[in-house]
Design a protein with these regions (language model features):
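Surface-exposed loop/linker segments characteristic of extracytoplasmic
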Residues: 2-250
Length: 250
C-alpha cells in the first residue's frame, strides 16, 4: 500500500510539472539562480518544487513568497516558508515524517529532480552528455528531451530515515557543493566513474527507497516505473541523460 501511495504521489507531481509546462511553455528549472545575487547571499535558490506549487493546490503558499529574496527557514522576508509540511512530497515508507530533520528542519521531499550523471557542485553544467532534466536555470522544452520523454527519467525518490541518506527538501537548493538542502539528485555517474546504482550508497543518489527490491521513478512523459536494484547500470545511466542518443540496453 505504501508503494502504491508513493506511485500516486509521483504521478501527481509529474502531472503538476506537465501543467506548469503547459502554462509556461517550459519544464520548471531545477533551481533559479538570479542575475542579481544581492538578496541571495547564502545561495538559497528557489527550485522546481516551489515553482509547481500553484499546480498542486498550494496557490496560497505560493502567493506568500517573495521571489526577489532567498528562502531561509529562520530569517528574512520568506521566514518559515521552507518549513511548510507537504504530505504529497513524502513517501509513506520513509519514517522520518514531513519535516527533514537532517536538513535544518525544512519541509521534506522524498521526490527529487534528475540532475544528471555528474556530481552536484558549484559548477552547474547546462550542456553535457551527462545532463538530466533539472539543472540550474534549465527551463527545457519537451523537444530538448532528444532521447524521448518515455525513455528519460524526470524524478526519483530518496529516503531520509537510514544510513547517510538525507532525503531532500521541496523548496530548492542551498550552499551547493557543501552538503546542501537539495531538490535534485544524481544518477549512477559517467561511463568512467560509476558511483551509484538503484539503492546505491552515495548520499546524492537520485533513487533509494524502502520499497523492497528497488525504487520508483517518474519519466518525462508522466509515467511511473519501478527500477530494480539489479538494473543494468548502463541502461540506468542512459535513462538519466536527456540527449545522449544511446539505445537503452536490456
Amino acid at each position: 500500500a505504501r508503494r502504491t501511495s508513493c506511485v500516486s504521489n509521483m504521478k501527481q507531481l509529474a502531472l503538476a510539472i506537465h501543467n506548469y509546462k503547459d502554462a509556461q511553455k517550459v519544464i520548471p528549472p531545477g533551481w533559479q539562480k538570479p542575475a542579481d545575487l544581492t538578496n541571495f547571499g547564502y545561495g538559497n535558490y528557489w527550485g522546481w518544487g516551489t515553482f509547481i506549487l500553484p499546480f498542486t493546490e498550494q496557490v496560497a503558499l505560493y502567493d506568500q513568497i517573495d521571489f526577489g529574496h532567498q528562502w531561509l527557514i529562520d530569517s528574512g522576508v520568506n521566514k518559515g516558508i521552507s518549513a511548510t509540511q507537504l504530505a504529497g512530497r513524502c513517501c509513506p515508507s520513509d519514517t522520518m515524517g514531513l519535516i527533514n530533520t537532517k536538513r535544518n528542519n525544512n519541509g521534506k521531499s522524498n521526490y527529487l529532480g534528475s540532475f544528471g550523471n555528474k556530481g552536484i557542485n558549484n559548477t552547474q553544467y547546462t550542456t553535457s552528455t551527462n545532463r538530466g532534466v533539472f539543472t540550474e536555470n534549465s527551463k527545457l522544452r519537451f523537444r530538448d528531451i532528444i532521447d524521448g520523454t518515455s525513455q528519460t527519467i524526470m524524478l526519483g525518490e530518496r529516503i531520509g530515515d537510514r544510513g547517510n541518506y538525507k532525503a531532500g527538501v521541496w523548496v530548492g537548493v542551498r550552499a551547493l557543493g557543501n552538503g546542501p538542502e537539495c531538490t535534485v539528485g544524481r544518477g549512477p555517474g559517467s561511463a568512467t566513474n560509476i558511483v551509484n546504482t538503484i539503492n546505491g550508497s552515495n548520499a546524492w543518489t537520485l533513487s533509494v527507497s524502502n520499497h523492497p527490491g528497488g525504487a520508483n521513478v517518474a519519466k518525462v512523459d508522466g509515467s511511473v516505473a519501478f527500477l530494480t536494484n539489479s538494473i543494468n547500470v548502463t541502461a540506468y545511466r542512459y535513462m538519466i541523460q536527456i540527449d545522449d542518443g544511446q539505445v537503452i540496453p536490456d
